[in-house]
Amino acid sequence: MARVKRGVIARARHKKILKQAKGYYGARSRVYRVAFQAVIKAGQYAYRDRRQRKRQFRQLWIARINAAARQNGISYSKFINGLKKASVEIDRKILADIAVFDKVAFHHSG
């Protein structure tokens, strides 16, 4: 059997991981073993947080709408219920934007 020399492939794989770990602190950006673990963990966090971001933004929008609605003397749930009954189909993202940047329009919507 022919001798298999794997140096090129191993170096390429190591380079790829170290490139991904660029900017990490200390050994995490220099030592392959540590960098590999850091990159794997970073990927797990990124995967988890892409899902959490959607929840967090919805929470933020609801908090902003609630605050603006209460300034106009109505609770969030009653405000949303009123919009549903009036068959107004504006999502929470746009409502929150209006609540923050156009208080007059928001006041007239409720």
Swiss-Prot record:
MF annotations from Gene Ontology: rRNA binding; structural constituent of ribosome
Which Pfam family, an example, fits this chain? Ribosomal_L20
Source organism, top-level taxon:
Bacteria
Cellular component per GO? ribonucleoprotein complex; ribosome
Keywords in alphabetical order, please.
Ribonucleoprotein, Ribosomal protein, RNA-binding, rRNA-binding
Q: Does the keyword Ribonucleoprotein apply?
A: yes
Name any Gene Ontology BP term: ribosomal large subunit assembly
InterPro entries of this UniProt entry? Answer: Ribosomal_bL20, RIBOSOMAL_L20_CS, Ribosomal_protein_bL20_C
Q: Which PANTHER family match?
A: 39S RIBOSOMAL PROTEIN L20
Write out the similarity annotation: Belongs to the bacterial ribosomal protein bL20 family.
The record's listing under NCBIfam families reads: rplT_bact (TIGR01032)
Q: What does this protein do?
A: Binds directly to 23S ribosomal RNA and is necessary for the in vitro assembly process of the 50S ribosomal subunit. It is not involved in the protein synthesizing functions of that subunit.
Q: Under what name is this protein listed? A: Large ribosomal subunit protein bL20
